[in-house]
């Protein structure tokens, strides 16, 4: 009995100390920030554009890796997969110095689902071909419009102009086809256009004067690139020919989404449009 009581009162054996729990893993933003840029660039080069947009939001390191060099392997690889070989091989994109700029231009090309049924967008993604349909005026809008910022794009005809050839802008509501040979862009209050044939400015079915405002303005030459400048801050539309600023054609544009657009009447003519991005001042 006494021995049992003594044993019951004995202290418990010492417990070995337990190791502290491991520290939690670093947040994803910290871990990702340690990856070398060359490794990230290699991984990013296999991703599509929506995934790249998501990656750019992970951390500053990833964002800088994606957008620091517009000629990096990431954009070269994506450009090669999406932009047509013809567009990259010919001079269509000659005024775009980087792969990222070429990708951006492709995203802003003509919309094959938002154009007249009498035109189609060629495989290069930048050129509109009008079929030889009699008594029809046919147009097309780009895939992306603008409601803010400053934007520039180039347009040029690669075939005859016919009696009407108009470049300009349009809302989503503006029609892209009508009967007869007319200036479709500028035929209502939803579009603004410059007719390259007679140099008239058109809006709301009316002629708003000649353009450019000079004596004996030169006629448009086939293949000549016209630069269009849309300023949604000042609400103006202007044009350039070569390195010459021709002036502001329209003022007081509405605060709505406006799309680069063209309209044509000549059968088998072709029109190319290339988005350039933000215009360079001066």
UniProtKB/Swiss-Prot annotation:
Pathway info: Protein modification; protein ubiquitination
Transmembrane domains' residue ranges: none
Domain F-box: 29-78
Keyword tRNA-binding: no
Disulfide bonds: none
Pfam families: F-box-like, SPRY
Location of region: Disordered: 1-32
Residue intervals of the B30.2/SPRY domain: 88-280
Alphabetically ordered keywords of this record: Ubl conjugation pathway
GO biological process terms on file: protein ubiquitination; ubiquitin-dependent protein catabolic process
Organism domain of life: Eukaryota
Keyword Transport assigned: no
Segments of skewed composition (Pro residues): 10-28
InterPro entries, sorted: B30.2/SPRY, B30.2/SPRY_sf, ConA-like_dom_sf, F-box-like_dom_sf, F-box_dom, FBXO45-Fsn/SPSB_families, SPRY_dom, SPRY_FBXO45
Assembly notes: Probable component of a E3 ubiquitin ligase complex.
Protein name listed in UniProt: F-box/SPRY domain-containing protein 1
Organism from which the protein derives: Xenopus tropicalis
